[in-house]
């Protein structure tokens, strides 16, 4: 085929579509399709036409047609102007930074109203006796029994309702607020049941802040700091999380070892209702400690009456220092005694 004739045709098309090419309204391949459609006898296929378009617009990258008046070389800047990325809806979940230089009592998995009164009171008394001024509630303070996706026992409605559970949780929060200088409430997967229940059964109301659990519990009113279930906290060099935030942490050894395999940094968690500790060093000489705390709920729930085989009552104190280091007392509670 006469190359000159092909070139003249391509240049004419480029001239006719110059503005659209510059604005990104048509691609070189799109222009090649138009050329091939009108001149199928001159070009073998669309790709042949596209090669000619690239050659005569100076985009082929081999120095061909350097003097072409229609040089339309692709650039990142041009692409950004012609085609903008869609706005992302992703929200950056920044870590919650806890103040160092203080001593914390860490409680998790109380599961009101299925709490163990003796174990819970013992944990609070022990924390105060050890000089803890801050209380960190590390998730699953309330059970949210009536908002679960699992089958519930309808007979229990005679004993307590959603309102009962909310009121008991508020009563507990008001109580601990008198015992400590500062209370933090990190939501766990059981608190998250509330939001999921609204989405599924009352989606028209779920966008109203009034129905957010942290507002129903009046946390801000009582100066209790709320931390969402999808955020983790950092206390110096110690990461604190409920335990549901990351999948695949099960370990046949213990929860602490399973979380170490995932986090690879010093971490404290609840969720598994089991006291365990895993210590390991790194090749750089750093020391890592991972701690899973026991629970403060019944050890014989209806859905798992032998849970006490693996579960145990327990909590932890963490003394944090200004340099980010920390000291942990991951204690068990047996018959009301903190060990």
What do these predicted ranges mean?
Residues 1-17:
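Basic, short loop/linker segments at the boundary and entry of helix-turn-helix/winged-helix-like folds
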Residues 14-39:
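Short, charged amphipathic recognition helices of the HTH superfamily
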Residues 29, 41-73:
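Major-groove recognition helix of helix-turn-helix-like DNA-binding domains
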Residues 79-117, 235-236:
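Mobile, glycine- and charge-enriched loop segments
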Residues 102-104, 134-136, 238-239, 266-268:
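Structural motif
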Residues 107, 112-220:
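Core catalytic region of metal-dependent phosphoesterases/phosphodiesterases
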Residues 201-239, 243, 250-253, 292-297:
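Active-site-proximal loop/helix segment associated with metal-binding centers of metalloenzymes
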Residues 241-331, 336:
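Conserved beta-sheet core of the metallophosphoesterase superfamily
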